[in-house]
A protein has these predicted regions:
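Charged, flexible cofactor/metal-binding loops and thiol motifs
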Residues: 3, 74, 146, 240-280, ...
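ABC ATPase NBD Q-loop/coupling interface
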Residues: 65-87, 125, 196, 337-359, ...
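Conserved ABC ATPase "signature" region
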Residues: 128-147, 341-344, 399-416
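A short, proline-enriched helix->beta-strand linker immediately N-terminal to the Walker B motif
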Residues: 171-175, 440-444
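Short, glycine/charged-rich "phosphate-handling" switch motifs in NTP-dependent
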Residues: 225, 237, 494, 506
Length: 579
């Protein structure tokens, strides 16, 4: 029996340049999931966009076949007229994208946008379309379909936006769904729920799924067949059991080595708490109008150590980072203390004079999630690295240039790059440059806000290696912000898990992973996709911990919005619980 979709020797190029996708072949059967795996620039997204012929204007299909089995006929989508192709897009073949806000109009109600799919491809009235859309909303997990129908995209959370995109793509019951990094921009528990939803829809409808991803953990949980791509070519392909169980190509092995996993720790030997701290948040609260973003956070960073705050969007972790650096003020009664050395007196970051703040900013710096936030596209690298020195009047022009060269060497880059602009560098190189800029003033503390989340897995591993190396060589302390427990398990000495502005559990990563107590911590661990087909995501655990705090088990439940206290459940292990 022929495959539902067969792509053979597909070659795509831009202008007269060499091919960006070169002789790529793959196929997917009805009811099957095919994963296209690779890092940024591998050609996986371009290959899938070619199926629906939604390539960038300057790109064209140079050769190859894209054959779709449609109602008993073979249709070569690469050569189909635009008029006939419009009848297939959204009907027989649908696609969902990484960022739903780019696909959902903010000017039109969600229900009207999805109804349009049915009025275009089905002979039905708006009233009939609405009923089908409401049924699809309920199917994809909206608790109140009528409200979702009337909502605008910006009124929904990221997870709900992606559910709306899935509803739009599946409402016409396509034979093939292409999902391009559908969960990359989502929190861990939301990602797990969306992956579970896709599997459920596929099982019920029998549709085929092409899943584009860079995450081998997602592949292990979803795929029947795997195609690994790099630089526009297929490196390896086969069943998920074969490719994930015994990868043959060096590039596939490299992806596996770089994939973040939550280690299986033994219960650790008890360690004494460090008495000396460099940073300490005391009873920190922050409200924005009626929203309590941070509520009673107490957290200290021991000198020379890494303390991580883990949580999902809206947990308050980034607000804590900004308050720690004095970029935002905590509510009255909250304090942030900084100690330059064990012998020095602590200063309150929240009440510094302008001169004191200027001095503090030399000693505490931030590394951002997106290096574009800290590197001006109009500045050469030498200017970006010497600007902090110039602002704080450090050294002569020659000394600043020497410092810039030294900084590049510290982050593993070459001095020949000084006269380049940021757009000449890869994402990983730009993050190295951001770290170099943060180190320019020889700080004692780095606050790292999701420094690896925007990077491919192999580059992510390199940046974590760099941060560990710099910490050891320069005796730095880190406050490390992340949504990924696998990342912090690797780098942190202590982890605080936040949910809706409160710390719900705090311990060493070894203790937290070996003996998690809070349902939300367990949900974060369960939601992390492991690159192992024998360790699937536990959706029941995810649903239990990711729900509303008032629905948690009795020992952890909030009552009328009032949280249980954060107690020392055992030595060096804090849990927010009534028990």
């Amino acid at each position: 029996m022929p495959s539902l979709l067969s792509v053979k020797d597909l070659t795509i190029g831009f202008g007269k340049n060499k091919p960006t996708v070169d002789q790529v072949s793959f196929s997917v059967d009805a009811g099957e999931t095919l994963a296209l795996v690779g890092e940024s620039g591998s050609g996986k997204t371009l290959s899938c966009r070619a199926i629906l012929r939604i390539l960038p204007n300057s790109a064209d299909i140079r050769s190859g076949e894209i054959v779709l089995q449609s109602r008993g006929n073979d249709i070569d989508l690469a050569r189909l007229s635009e008029r006939k192709l419009r009848g297939i897009r959204g009907d027989r073949v649908s696609m969902i994208f990484q960022e739903p806000m780019r696909s959902l109009s903010p000017l039109h109600r969600i229900g009207h946008q999805i109804s349009e799919v049915l009025t275009l491809h089905r002979d039905c009235s708006m009233a009939e379309a609405k009923q089908q859309v409401l049924a699809e909303f309920e199917h994809v997990g909206f608790n109140d379909p009528e409200r979702a129908y009337r909502a605008y995209s910006f009124e929904l959370s990221g997870g709900m936006q992606q559910r709306a995109m899935i509803a739009m793509a599946t409402v016409a019951k396509p034979a093939l769904l292409i999902a391009d990094e559908p969960t990359t921009a989502l929190d861990m528990t939301t990602q797990a729920q969306v992956l579970g939803l896709l599997k459920k829809l596929q099982a019920e409808s029998g549709m085929a799924l092409i899943l584009v991803t860079h995450d081998l953990g997602v592949v292990a949980n979803m795929a029947d067949q795997v195609v690994v791509m790099n630089k526009g070519r297929v490196m390896e392909s086969g069943s998920s059991n074969l490719v994930l169980g015994a990868p043959a190509h060096p590039y596939t092995k490299k992806l596996f080595q770089a994939a973040p996993v939550i280690p299986e720790f033994e219960r650790p030997v008890e360690q004494p708490k460090a008495a000396d701290f460099i940073l300490s948040l005391r009873d920190v609260r922050k409200t924005y109008g009626a929203i309590q973003a941070v509520d009673g956070v107490n957290l200290s960073v021991p000198r020379g150590k890494v303390v991580a705050i883990v949580g999902e969007s809206g947990s308050g972790k980034s607000t804590c980072a900004r308050i720690a650096l004095g970029a935002e003020l905590a509510n009255p009664g909250g304090h942030v203390f900084f100690k330059e050395s064990p012998e020095a007196d602590a200063i309150d970051v929240q009440s510094l004079s302008p001169a004191e703040r200027n001095d503090f900013q030399r000693k505490a710096q931030m590394v951002f999630q997106d290096p574009h936030s800290s590197l001006s596209p109009r500045m050469q690298i030498i200017d970006a690295l010497t600007e902090p020195l110039d602002i704080h009047s450090v050294g002569t022009v020659a000394e600043r240039r020497d410092r810039a060269i030294e900084l590049l060497e510290q982050v593993g880059l070459d001095s020949s790059m000084l006269r380049r602009y940021p757009n000449a560098f890869s994402g990983g190189q730009r993050q190295r440059l951001s770290i170099a800029r943060a180190l320019a003033l020889r700080p004692l503390l780095l606050v790292c806000d999701e420094p690896t989340s925007a990077l491919d897995v192999s580059v992510q591993a390199q940046i974590l290696d760099l941060l560990e190396d710099i910490r050891d060589r320069l005796n730095l302390s880190y406050l490390f912000i992340s949504h990924d427990l696998a990342v912090v398990a690797r780098i942190a000495d202590e982890v605080a898990v936040m949910r809706r502005g409160r710390v719900v559990e705090q311990a060493s990563p070894e203790l937290l992973m070996a003996n998690p107590k809070h349902p939300y911590t367990r949900a974060l661990i369960a939601a992390h996709p492991e690159p192992d087909i024998h360790r699937p995501i536990n959706l029941e655990t995810v649903a239990l911990g990711a729900g509303d705090p008032e629905s948690w088990p009795d020992a952890f439940r909030y009552t009328d919005g009032v949280a249980p206290p954060l107690i020392e459940y055992e030595s060096n292990h804090l849990v927010r619980t009534h028990v």
